[in-house]
Each structure stands twice: as C-alpha cells, then as structure tokens.
Amino acid sequence: MEKRIGSILLAVCLLLLASCGAKRETVAVEPDIAAQSSVPEADLTSLRQLSQEGALWQLDGTTLYTTVAAPQSRGKLLQTVDLNTGKRQALCSKPGCTHQDESCGAWLDCESEIAVLPMEDGRLVLVYGRYGPLEKQGAELSAAVELRDTSGAVLCPATPLPHRPSGAFYTDEIAVYYLREQWQEDGSADVSLIRIELDAAKGFGQASTAAFWQLPVMLSLTERCTEQGMLAIRWEHRMEGQTQVVQHRELCLVQWDGTVRTVAEAKDEQAFLVPDTGAIAAFCFDSATGTMARLDLATGESEPFARLPEGLQLTEGSACVGNVLICNFIQDGEAKPFYLEKGGEPVEIRRQTSHNGYLRPAMVLDVLEDGRLIVDLGDLEYEESYTDQTGQWITSRTSETLLGVCTPEQYREGAADCLTLETNHKF
C-alpha cells in the first residue's frame, strides 16, 4: 500500500461541547435554508454512510480495498486485503497476470485517491480522479465512476462525472451520494447532495441533485447522517485574551426537507463530539469538569457516560462501538487517545507509533462491521529499486503505513495482539 496516511490532525479545536441536559422538541424552520430534490424516487431516509472524509481505505466488513501505483505505467492497481488473514492480492482474475501495467485487470486510469464503495449485492462502485489535459484555472477536475464485481470484472465502464467528488459517500443501494459544498463570499455554503445513478438502463453515472441546502456561516455539517437528515454543529467565535477560539452552541439535525432541528444547546466549557466512524452517536464533553455524557438524538436528553481528568481538550479522531467511545484529547500540548466505556474508568492508550521519525499515539482509523478496529501501527521504511524512463537504475528509501486489526478490548491493552495486515512491500 502506498503511504497515503498522513498525520491525523491533532490541532486543538477547543471544541466546547453542548449542554447535555437541554431537551428541545420544536422544529425551527429557517428561511435561508431550503432543500429541493430533482430525484423524486430517491429515498433519503434509507441512506447509510459508506466512507468518511479522508478515509484511505474502503471496507465491506471482511475486505479492505486499496490502490498502489502501477509499477510500469501510469495509473493505479486495485488491491484487496483479507481482514481475517491479513493477506493482500490484486483484484484481477486474468491467468498469469504479473500486475505491472494497464494490461492488468486491476488497472485504473486513476491519478488521485479512489473511493471503492461496496454495495450489499456485491457490486463495487469506483469513484476516482482521472488523468486529463491541464485544467483551466477554476475549471472542475476530471473524475469518473465505474462498476465492477468482486472478481474485478467491469460491469459498467468508466463514465465521466461533472466534477470531482470529495468527502464522505452514502448509498441507498440504488445509487451513491456525496456532498458538494460551494462557499460564498459571506462565508455561507450552498450544499448539494449529489446522486450518482448505478442502473445502466437509467443512465449509469448520471449525476443529479437529491437535496440542496443554503447553510448560514456558522452551521457546519459533520457528514454523519440519520434517517432524518445530516448532523451539524452551530458554533461561534469568542475571544480569550488575544486568542480567538471556537465555541459550540448547538447540535443540530439538518433534515432532508430543509428544516433544522436543534438537538441540544451548549454552555461554556462544553463541546459536542459526533464520532467520525462506527455507530452514529453524539456526546457532550465538559472540559471544566471532565464529564462526558451521551446524547439521545431524538430528544436531546443526556445520560452520564464517563468521567475524565479536568482540563482535557477534545481534538479530531473518534470512534464509537456500542458502549465504547475512543477519542483523542490534548493535555499539556500532547495528544492522548482515551478508551472510554460507559460507567467505567477511562484508559489512556500509551502505545506509540513512529511516523517520519516522530512518535505519536496509535490511532483508530476505522471500525469494521463486526466491531473490530483498523489501527495505525506506524511506518514501515524500506528501500525500493526501479528503472526510470532513461533506463537508469534508481534506488531510494520509501515507507508505507502499517495497519492492524484488533478488538476494542485489544486496543485498550495497547493493540499488542492485533492482526497486522500485509504491506505492499511484502506483496
């Protein structure tokens, strides 16, 4: 696997979480937020999230899909990793294939990160940036979508998309969806939920708008969705001396019909946490008291979840599995992941991993359908040799990220017994 996993962002957001006790049942309809759909048949209440923003792998519960640079041509080769054995192979069924160039069945004319989106019926939807002529300033970057089966055979060939998607993807098993944000000069955002057709008879790859919102300046989507809509956080700036910090004010649900419902309200020193991966949930953390509470998304009511040391500040990176929450904090300028179980004592994860010569905590990157975790185990550095375009033999040092699979309980104990996935270097 190519090294694509950069440093998980650990800059302090001074996220100050929302009041855990506020119960709000009214629905506030805001005149500047409107939803509209050009796809009457789209059932947005059945959407499930397929990937998170920035995810560098795609999972169907048993398989990890990834790409590597084609050794002897441009483009990338699609690979799979068995999440029960750790073994890696090219997604190619051609007998005798050496998996080197565009003749390989796993080859993609791809020049940017790829999203591999597994459907429940076994189809794989591939969305990726494509090579093309130099773009004019302000023009959309090239992108394509194609459909394959689990053997790698092409069901629908690469079809151009009107613009290059980014962020999370969703599906109702009929189409795939993604969010497209267009920022305005006043800081507000026009947000479209774009639907990509998967039925060849209806025009595979055809893009349309399934929903549209005009969001005010200080209302930000989290990309996590429920049956009713997208979770969002309303925030504001405040000053602490000469420092401008972000203060959370409301946890909201931007509903599919365009209305916005307030789930809970914030007090000073509190912040909302909507886990990046795993179960759809919301938590409230009070940095002054160290109290973590879980919020009921339907009523806004809260229940105590865990107690942490005072003075911690939430930062990015979190996962929820049942009654277990794994999240990252900053304390005295250092990043510290914690394992929290409802009603139990918090456990600081002390395992360190090396990235580019720097140590940092072992981070949870994703949650499998069976509740196991994908964990960043640090970098593997090695030498690689190849012949360049002039015929010269080149040797250089490179690295790729080691990934492990473990249960939440194994992670709590330092992930020493995790399954290490085979690297591309060993493949």
Where are these regions (language model features)?
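Residue-level signature of beta-propeller blades and closely related beta-rich strand-turn architectures
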Residues: 70, 130-132, 182, 236-237, ...
